[in-house]
């Protein structure tokens, strides 16, 4: 299956050489394409309509926050081809001010997914028919899945029995959180705590 995905990645990259920046089959056997943000509609249309691809189902659109990068956000599209029994992941990099073209014209289901990415990360989508919050309250400040968003949020919302309505109050904590450097390396297969002292 891995070779078939590598061949598919090469097939797509050869068909769209100006739009596809890179292809990769990861160790889990998943094909990822990195494409130019301006080309996302063209690439998604090709993946949906080309006889060698036929990725007719948009499974999900999600965001990833990389605060250390200049283009801080990745928008990640997950597609499924029932005809060829294959999946592909399409990644686009963007920053806080640059809008990614909406793919709602190609996959209508992208409407809610893109709204969720905007609500959680603040990634803008141009030509979206209804870009507004979908998971948080209308008066919510900020985007809660960004790594620099405070764990406690900014306000606390609760129902007040006396006034018979929802009220917003500043967050009150009995103990402050410790400072956390979210750019520090984490324990993982390539780095263990204390490795930096070994050299």
Swiss-Prot record:
It is an enzyme of class 7 (translocase). The keyword NAD applies. The keyword Transport applies. Its main location: membrane. This is NADH-quinone oxidoreductase subunit C. It is found in: Cell inner membrane. Its EC number is 7.1.1.-. Belongs to the complex I 30 kDa subunit family. PANTHER family: NADH DEHYDROGENASE [UBIQUINONE] IRON-SULFUR PROTEIN 3, MITOCHONDRIAL (PTHR10884:SF14), NADH DEHYDROGENASE UBIQUINONE IRON-SULFUR PROTEIN 3 (PTHR10884). NDH-1 shuttles electrons from NADH, via FMN and iron-sulfur (Fe-S) centers, to quinones in the respiratory chain. The immediate electron acceptor for the enzyme in this species is believed to be ubiquinone. Couples the redox reaction to proton translocation (for every two electrons transferred, four hydrogen ions are translocated across the cytoplasmic membrane), and thus conserves the redox energy in a proton gradient. Disulfide bonds: none annotated. Keywords: Cell inner membrane, Cell membrane, Membrane, NAD, Quinone, Translocase, Transport, Ubiquinone. It is a peripheral membrane protein. InterPro entries: NADH_DH_suC, NADH_quin_OxRdtase_su_C/D-like, NADH_UbQ_OxRdtase_30kDa_su, NADH_UbQ_OxRdtase_CS. It comes from Paramagnetospirillum magneticum (strain ATCC 700264 / AMB-1) (Magnetospirillum magneticum). It catalyses: a quinone + NADH + 5 H(+)(in) = a quinol + NAD(+) + 4 H(+)(out). One of its GO terms (cellular component) is plasma membrane. GO terms for molecular function: NADH dehydrogenase (ubiquinone) activity; NADH:ubiquinone reductase (non-electrogenic) activity; quinone binding. The gene is nuoC. NDH-1 is composed of 14 different subunits. Subunits NuoB, C, D, E, F, and G constitute the peripheral sector of the complex. It comes from the Bacteria. Gene3D superfamilies: NADH:ubiquinone oxidoreductase, 30kDa subunit.
């Amino acid at each position: 299956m891995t070779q078939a995905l590598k061949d598919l990645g090469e097939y797509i990259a050869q068909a769209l050489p100006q739009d596809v920046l890179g292809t990769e089959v990861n160790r889990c056997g998943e094909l990822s394409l990195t494409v130019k943000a301006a080309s996302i509609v063209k690439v998604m249309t090709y993946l949906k309509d080309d006889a060698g691809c036929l990725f007719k189902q948009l499974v999900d659109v999600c965001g990833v926050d990389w605060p250390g990068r200049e283009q801080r956000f990745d928008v990640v599209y997950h597609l499924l081809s029932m005809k060829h029994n294959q999946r592909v992941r399409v990644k686009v990099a963007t920053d806080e001010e640059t809008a990614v073209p909406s793919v709602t014209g190609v996959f209508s289901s992208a409407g809610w997914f893109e709204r969720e990415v905007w609500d959680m990360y603040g990634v803008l989508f141009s030509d979206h028919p209804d870009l507004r919050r979908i998971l948080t309250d209308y008066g919510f400040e900020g985007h809660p899945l960004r790594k620099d968003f405070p764990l406690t949020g900014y306000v606390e919302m609760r129902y007040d029995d006396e006034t018979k309505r929802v009220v917003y109050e500043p967050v009150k904590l009995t103990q402050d959180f410790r400072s956390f450097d979210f750019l520090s390396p984490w324990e993982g297969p390539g780095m263990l705590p204390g490795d930096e002292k070994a050299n």
